[in-house]
């Protein structure tokens, strides 16, 4: 999972 700019974890990848 990649980290978003706002500091939220996204379940992508």
From Swiss-Prot:
GO-annotated molecular function: carbohydrate binding
Superkingdom of origin organism: Eukaryota
Keyword Cytoplasm recorded: no
Keyword RNA-binding: no
Keywords associated with the record: Hemagglutinin, Lectin, Mitogen
Gene Ontology biological process terms in this record: positive regulation of cell division
Function: Inulin-specific lectin. Has hemagglutinating activity towards rabbit erythrocytes. Has mitogenic activity towards murine splenocytes.
Subunit structure: Homodimer.
Protein name: Inulin-specific lectin
